[in-house]
């Protein structure tokens, strides 16, 4: 009995491996529609594309929740929104020493990138609080020169974007979360996704590398995920984090059903085929939702991970992830 051939749509997508050029929207939609039995074939191609055209190795970063809760936006998945009723720790912006302590721990554990994250809509204009964050960044650069400092502070304006660019941050994170056409329905209606997209454009015009992706499992369909992939391609972001929803008690999505595993695998793999040369990062849901299958997703096109914990939920120990990254290297 001969080996069954690849599905024609998957065979056609092998052009990405040869040329490094991404697949188009129609091809991505065709792959997204294939049944689960083809998921591992798509994943295998995505892993080959990552190895040939990606940045090499597995990028790791860690974040600190430097200001927690009492956010006025109504994001349906988020424990930090004051519209929701989650039991989380709430505190104002921490001091520089607290940030330095966390950042030094990252350096000691071999994590190269460290992100300062704050709750809230963002900083359209310069403020005392924003100046404090700039001072934190300056101190990290001064005392930990090997550390790549990142930030995720919400929506920015021209002055605040320019100020961050002047501080030489490695990446700025702001996610579009879902396909822009369904943002108000699936994520939040207290602000528009265009405000986030304009922040990406502002930062890129100022020479800042942008980390921008989304979340899956919030009620979207595979077709919606493909549309998000192409919105990200139009924005030309550098790093693409993919979060798998971790339902949190007290949020509107606390009872959201788990996604079928084959859909998650296809989402990661097709993202790689649409973005063959970008860093694709597995963020939330890696340990808590995917559990035994997290390694499979890291072999489905992803080449980055968030380590050491998330904003309001625990992650895996950095030492465990360091061993995990070393094991993944054998597939490169």
UniProtKB/Swiss-Prot annotation:
Cofactor binding annotation: Binds 1 [4Fe-4S] cluster. The cluster is coordinated with 3 cysteines and an exchangeable S-adenosyl-L-methionine.
Protein purpose: Catalyzes the conversion of dethiobiotin (DTB) to biotin by the insertion of a sulfur atom into dethiobiotin via a radical-based mechanism.
Swiss-Prot/TrEMBL catalytic activity: (4R,5S)-dethiobiotin + (sulfur carrier)-SH + 2 reduced [2Fe-2S]-[ferredoxin] + 2 S-adenosyl-L-methionine = (sulfur carrier)-H + biotin + 2 5'-deoxyadenosine + 2 L-methionine + 2 oxidized [2Fe-2S]-[ferredoxin]
Molecular-function annotations in GO: 2 iron, 2 sulfur cluster binding; 4 iron, 4 sulfur cluster binding; biotin synthase activity; iron ion binding
Involved pathway(s): Cofactor biosynthesis; biotin biosynthesis; biotin from 7,8-diaminononanoate: step 2/2
Name of this chain's protein: Biotin synthase
Quaternary assembly: Homodimer.
EC number: 2.8.1.6
Gene Ontology biological process terms, A to Z: biotin biosynthetic process
Domain Radical SAM core: 53-283
Record-listed [4Fe-4S] cluster binding positions: 71, 75, 78
Protein species of origin: Chlorobium luteolum (strain DSM 273 / BCRC 81028 / 2530)
InterPro entries in UniProt: Aldolase_TIM, BATS_dom, Biotin_synth/BioAB, Biotin_synthase, Elp3/MiaA/NifB-like_rSAM, rSAM
Stated family: Belongs to the radical SAM superfamily. Biotin synthase family.
Residues annotated for [2Fe-2S] cluster binding in this entry: 150, 211, 281
Cofactors required: [4Fe-4S] cluster; [2Fe-2S] cluster
